[in-house]
């Protein structure tokens, strides 16, 4: 933590300078990203591997789920245990799904028992923008950010009231409804958005899944809302309240109790109160209290009176961030206090955890040179203190070009299930840690962009299930048994050619267990995505192609559980038939390919979806 004298010195240094205009994009169409440095900055000046997905891009593509949107991004792969509403895992740069932090409007959404986030229950209708940060970010966001951060921003109010609504129907009994309004009246900005989705689904499991195979249709239902209210108390001083909730019900085939246990209910909630105060051209303070809850229940044969499992995580977090913009650069000083508590129908020997953290970050632009550094100390009441850091340097050697190098460390504390799950937890586990190095070359100018990133991440104390006593078949426990090295490169490009908007990416990756030499499960060694969209009068026509190579389906790389490579083609069309009105169409898996992203679990065949959207 910082001493008062050190803070005073930084404040006095800041007040001596002029405002640092780091949040003003240089190039037309240069997206602004917040997640990469905890302050707004143009993507072209960001010393991190980051991507911004806008509302316009989501609507144009007609994507059905958040998993679809994420799977099209470079160095991001998704493994799903079936169709809509099924458990899904995110692998950023080949890191474990528990190595990704997911934020909704700055609020961490997380299951402290599983150690992951139920992204399958976050509907696209609520999303205004998605920011994806690849690489270690523990020095900015604390535990779990070994692989990266995904931040979801819900819709915000500004200007005249803008209404939106949409309806969509399609294959497998799919139906969606959404409606909302956002705007500003005087000194009050507001937004309110509702959505509903349902599907009859398809069988989550296939015959390769000998433990849980149940050839029925696994349906899904999701209801959600998001709301925000911002009151400007005086110029530069805003008070904001945000609410977010999704409620989902799903048929499931992935439980490990018995095959008949096949219904689940889950709820994600997030609430926050934030005071943002710009005291002068130098100092901006943001104080936030956030509360989130992840609740999941499972039931036998759809009988909601016969609950068979229950897990709930409640998180309360205070966070204070101070941005000091000076002619010497941008200083960020912050502190946070996080309380996590779990509840379950099982008995855990410990059900709460407290983490206190202090962090500092620095950003400088000096001529053609860019510098960013951050340092954070997290003190966990179970594991003590953990220091993480990150440093990056960039050189703008030509108009639109940036070469950069970076190094960072990350860590993850074991989940409550890893530590204390009844009869199988291991309270002696140590946190996982990582060291990441990357080199990148990127170009962004006049609506064209390209980047090449080389990365290597070494993860130590990797937690995997292991047999602690070879003579006892019941002695399997989570254990710090492995180290892993993940090397790779990602290539991205976007441009207009022949009056067609092109976007594409390619990822090559070598992700291995250092101890055994085996490939890490569910990580494709090669993957690529390309999309093309053509606007013609009132029409937008487009297509997507996604390919992924062969992958290991388990940690032992057994041939019987291998996941074969695949290629999937999607098509979309939009027709603007009146002011603010658009008819939409999308075909997923146009050629009805059969493939798996997780061993023993199906993906959807050909699906056709038609809709109408109103948007002011």
Show where each model-derived region lies:
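Periplasmic-side early beta-strands and strand-to-turn transitions of outer-membrane beta-barrels
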Residues: 138-139, 151, 158-160, 166-168, ...
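N-terminal periplasmic accessory domains that precede
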Residues: 66-69, 86-91, 100, 118-123, ...
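Face-selective signature of the C-terminal outer-membrane beta-barrel domain
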Residues: 230-248, 265-396, 451-454, 496, ...
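Short acidic/polar hinge/loop motifs at secondary-structure boundaries
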Residues: 107-134
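Gram-negative outer-membrane beta-barrel transporters
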Residues: 328, 332, 365-370, 456-458, ...
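Extracytoplasmic beta-strand/coil segments of soluble accessory domains associated
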Residues: 67, 71-107, 128
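Outer-membrane beta-barrel signature, preferentially recognizing the C-terminal barrel domain
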Residues: 257-278, 311-316, 381-382, 396, ...
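N-terminal Sec signal peptide and the immediately downstream disordered periplasmic leader
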Residues: 1-71, 183, 232
């Amino acid at each position: 933590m910082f001493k008062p004298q050190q803070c005073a010195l930084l404040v006095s240094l800041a007040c001596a300078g002029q405002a640092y205009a780091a949040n003003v994009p240089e190039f037309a169409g240069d997206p602004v990203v917040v997640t990469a440095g905890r302050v707004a900055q143009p993507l072209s000046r960001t010393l991190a591997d980051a991507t911004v997905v806008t509302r316009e891009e989501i609507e144009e593509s007609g994507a059905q789920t958040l998993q679809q949107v994420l799977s099209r991004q470079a160095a991001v792969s998704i493994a799903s245990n079936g169709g809509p509403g099924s458990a899904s895992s995110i692998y950023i740069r080949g890191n474990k799904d528990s190595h990704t932090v997911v934020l909704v409007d700055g609020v961490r959404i997380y299951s402290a028992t599983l150690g992951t986030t139920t992204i399958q229950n976050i509907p696209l209708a609520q999303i205004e923008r998605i920011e994806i940060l690849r690489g270690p970010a523990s020095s900015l966001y604390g535990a779990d950010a070994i692989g990266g951060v995904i931040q979801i921003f819900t819709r915000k109010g500004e200007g005249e009231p803008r209404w939106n609504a949409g309806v969509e129907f399609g294959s497998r009994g799919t139906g969606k409804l959404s409606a909302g309004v956002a705007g500003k009246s005087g000194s009050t900005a507001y937004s309110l958005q509702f959505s509903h989705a349902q599907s009859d689904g398809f069988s989550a499991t296939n015959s390769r899944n000998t433990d849980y195979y149940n050839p029925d249709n696994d349906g899904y239902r999701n209801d959600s809302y998001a709301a925000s209210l911002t009151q400007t108390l005086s110029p530069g001083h805003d008070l904001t309240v945000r609410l977010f909730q999704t409620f989902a019900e799903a048929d499931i085939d992935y439980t490990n109790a018995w095959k008949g246990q096949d219904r689940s209910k889950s709820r994600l909630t997030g609430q926050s109160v934030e005071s943002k105060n710009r005291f002068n051209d130098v100092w901006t303070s943001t104080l936030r209290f956030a509360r989130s809850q992840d609740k999941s229940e499972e039931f036998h044969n759809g009988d909601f009176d016969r609950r068979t499992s229950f897990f709930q995580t409640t998180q309360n977090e205070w966070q204070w961030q101070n941005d000091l913009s000076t002619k010497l650069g941008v200083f960020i000083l912050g502190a946070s206090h996080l309380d996590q508590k779990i509840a379950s129908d099982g008995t855990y020997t410990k059900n709460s955890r407290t983490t206190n953290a202090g962090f500092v970050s620095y950003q400088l632009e000096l001529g053609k040179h860019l510098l960013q550094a951050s340092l954070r100390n997290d003190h966990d009441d179970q594991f003590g203190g953990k220091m993480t850091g990150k440093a990056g340097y960039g050189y703008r050697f030509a108009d639109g070009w940036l070469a950069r190098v970076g190094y960072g460390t990350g860590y993850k504390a074991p989940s409550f299930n890893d530590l204390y799950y009844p009869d199988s937890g291991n309270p002696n586990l140590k946190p996982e840690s990582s060291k990441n190095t990357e080199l990148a070359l990127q170009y962004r100018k006049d609506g064209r962009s390209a980047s090449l990133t080389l990365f290597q991440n070494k993860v130590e104390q990797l937690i995997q299930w292991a047999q602690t006593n070879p003579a006892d078949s019941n002695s399997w426990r989570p254990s710090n048994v492995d180290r892993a090295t993940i090397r790779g490169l990602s290539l991205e490009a976007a441009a207009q050619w022949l009056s067609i908007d092109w976007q594409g990416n390619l990822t090559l990756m070598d992700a291995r267990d250092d101890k055994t030499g085996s490939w890490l499960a569910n990580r494709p060694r090669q993957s690529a995505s390309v999309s093309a969209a053509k606007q013609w009068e009132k029409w937008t026509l487009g297509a997507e192609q996604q390919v992924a190579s062969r992958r290991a389906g388990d940690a032992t790389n057994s041939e019987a559980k291998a996941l074969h490579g695949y290629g999937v083609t999607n098509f979309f069309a939009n027709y603007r038939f009146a002011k603010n009105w658009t008819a939409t169409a999308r075909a997923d898996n146009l050629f009805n390919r059969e493939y798996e992203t997780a061993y023993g679990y199906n993906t959807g065949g050909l699906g056709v979806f038609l809709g109408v959207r109103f948007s002011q």
